[in-house]
Amino acid sequence: MDRRSFAAALTLGSAAALFGARSASAAPPPDSSPRARNVVLVHGAYADGSCWSDVIPYLQARGLNVASVQNPLRTLDEDCDFARRTLALMDGPTVLAAHSYSGIIATEVGVDPKVTALVYIAARAPDAGEDYTALAAQYPTPPASAGLVKGADGYAQLSESAFLNDFAQDVAPARARALCTVQGRISDELFNGRTTQAAWRDKPTFYAVSKNDRTINPDLERFMANRMNAKTTELDASHLSIVSKAREVADLIIEAAGV
């Protein structure tokens, strides 16, 4: 091999190595995801599966098979098991969409081969083994956390005032009160769990930031979305954008599904 050929080969080898390093640390482009026919929706803390009720009809209208997980909200491991059971019922390519706390669930169980894309809606998105609480502490504390009311049994929920003013402030008051009534109570162990893997490193990822979020700091949402190389949209919404901006949320999930 002459000097010119050797230099060309060295350049190509270096480029390939660099590309490989990048591929290992960032998700593939969102537009590379295959077409999905299923969607699994996962709710967060202070909520239940019915919070997706306004999103679901838009997805079904596009021919998607939709399932909404009901999380026990006792431990991360148990919630992940519930999500896995739902994924096991899917018959092929599936988009996994998560709101709020359940972004941690999607990060963990999204490695399932059926999952073709991840959609985070104002959601937590830690790296593998990362202490999310420590990450969130780097940003100003959002107001909703002051409204957490814990019972003698160790389970907690948001007060009605916090729910209406800091969790769902752009939802009609009557609807917000109804949603507050059905919110799941969380155990004092729920937020102690950590992921062991990060599905977003290998799966096309989408993120909807809630610009008016008073439950998760919007700048933290932007940081996580950027770190995941997610295709990001910003919504003029509260934390509960899956209700107040249901059409926009559905459109993002439909885009992730490729239908």
Spell out what each predicted region is.
Residues 35-76:
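Conserved HGGG/HGGXW glycine-rich cap/lid loop of the alpha/beta-hydrolase fold
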